[in-house]
From Swiss-Prot:
Disulfide bonds: none annotated. Its EC number is 1.-.-.-. The chain crosses the membrane at residues 291-311. InterPro entries: NAD(P)-bd_dom_sf, SDR_fam. Belongs to the short-chain dehydrogenases/reductases (SDR) family. Keywords: Coiled coil, Endoplasmic reticulum, Membrane, NADP, Oxidoreductase, Transmembrane, Transmembrane helix. Residues 312-407 are cytoplasmic. It comes from Saccharomyces cerevisiae (strain ATCC 204508 / S288c) (Baker's yeast). The lineage of its organism: Eukaryota, Fungi, Dikarya, Ascomycota, Saccharomycotina. This is Uncharacterized oxidoreductase YNL181W. Pfam families: adh_short (PF00106). Signal peptide: none annotated.
Length: 407
């Protein structure tokens, strides 16, 4: 067909081509739209890596967007996945079975671990570490996160939601939970053999550039809730800074180990922050709709969707930078020039935008204060939990004694 059109234009002139004038007017707009869409979808990962026999902990895999796409690709390549979910209900069980069938990989499992609950995180980490010999672990892929509606100025103020531990939900889920999980799993990372390429890959967001760092109150327990965006951006910023310190600690501890008398470089365990780009994700839908179904239909689905389709990625296109971080040989020990945390955007390693990423003293203080405050909060919540348990037991005994007297 294109050859016939070109031949007609060359031999008989463009006047012989049907609807040529219409095509001439419309074509530039079509080409421009195609070019914008090609740019907005971002580059594709070109690396491949065999994952057979490798074991990964994965969060955010049930999102039906980027997380699901990454998990599907990893399962397809033969990886054993332990997927952490808030609940292991009927839907999650069916989803897991479907993923096994589609990828022909039976080594996909789901574990209950609510990342908004510090106690559940500690229970999971303790059960993971309570094994001899140490369990194999080739990486942790963190794609979970929470973004609360920003509210509408002068109409609808942002509503603060809290985790089970009383923390603001975005700080709890995006920062505290991931920090706590990875900090507790340090012994597992250090126990891996020197020839094992262990990759810890975490999702971040370009909005971190507008975040704040609360050194003295890193869990933001005493901060006023004026802006949901500020809490979200700060959670991502503090996560990135804390991971810089965690990487240094892991590297130094591994370097101090000796395997059969051989020195270790500590480069076999790497932490990478991935910025997948602006996607048409559940988070974006919640922000645009302000949590309203009516606004979701009118504003997102009808009015803004053509623009969003043109300038943003689909949730499944956002997986490319994650797959790049998982598969690129640039992060292998033999190719690493330094042990710093890497920042990946659009399938390439780029520099962090904030100057705080060069401040090691600030990162160390943030890490230490976060670790301290989490421990204090855990003790406080545990005391309350034990008090409630004791109260329930006493109430049960009283009711039993009363029923005996009545008999």
């Amino acid at each position: 067909m294109p050859l016939n059109i070109i031949g007609t234009a060359l031999l008989d002139g463009t006047d012989k081509i049907p609807y040529y004038q219409t095509i001439k007017k419309v074509a530039p707009y079509v080409l421009a739209t195609g070019a914008i869409k090609y740019w907005s979808r971002g580059p594709s990962n070109t690396w491949e890596r065999k994952l057979h026999g490798k074991v990964y902990l994965v969060t955010g895999a049930t999102s039906q967007g980027m997380g699901t796409s990454v998990a599907y690709k990893m399962a397809e390549l033969g990886a054993q996945l332990i997927i952490l979910t808030r609940e292991v209900d009927e839907w999650v069980t069916e989803w897991c079975e479907e993923l096994r069938e589609k990828t022909k990989n039976e080594l996909i499992f789901v574990e209950k671990c609510d990342l908004s609950n510090l106690w559940e995180i500690r229970k999971f980490a303790t059960s993971w570490l309570d094994n001899s010999p140490p369990r194999r672990l080739d990486g942790v892929i963190v794609m979970s996160g929470d973004m609360e509606p920003w509210g509408i100025p002068k109409i609808s103020l942002p509503q603060r939601r809290s985790s089970k531990d009383g923390l603001e939900l975005q700080i709890a889920t995006n920062y505290v939970a991931i920090f706590h999980l990875l900090n507790l799993l340090q012994p597992s990372f250090k126990a891996q053999p020197p020839d094992r390429d262990v990759r810890i890959i975490l999702a971040t967001c370009w909005l971190q550039v507008v975040g704040d760092i609360n050194i003295e109150d890193p869990l933001w327990q005493n901060a006023k809730y004026k802006s949901a965006l500020k809490f979200f951006a700060s959670s991502k910023l503090q996560l990135g800074l804390s991971m810089m310190e965690l990487q240094r600690r892991l590297t130094e501890d591994i370097k101090n180990q000796k395997t059969n008398g051989a020195e270790r470089t500590g480069k076999n365990v790497t932490i990478t922050m991935v910025q997948p780009g602006t996607m048409r994700s559940n988070s974006l839908r919640r922000v645009i709709s302000n949590g309203s179904v009516v606004l979701l239909i009118i504003l997102y689905c009808i009015l803004l969707y053509p623009i969003l389709w043109l300038f943003t990625k689909s949730g499944r296109r956002g997986d490319q930078s994650f797959l790049y971080a998982l598969m690129t040989p640039e992060l292998e020990e033999v190719n690493l020039k330094d042990t710093k945390v890497k920042y990946i955007s659009d399938c390439s390693i780029v520099k962090f935008a904030r100057k705080e990423f060069d401040d090691e003293e600030l990162q160390k203080k943030l890490f230490d204060n976060t670790e301290r405050d989490i421990l204090q909060l855990e003790k406080k919540v545990a005391a309350k939990r034990n008090a409630n348990k004791t109260g329930n037991q006493n109430s049960k005994k009283k009711s039993q004694n009363k029923s005996r007297k009545d008999d």
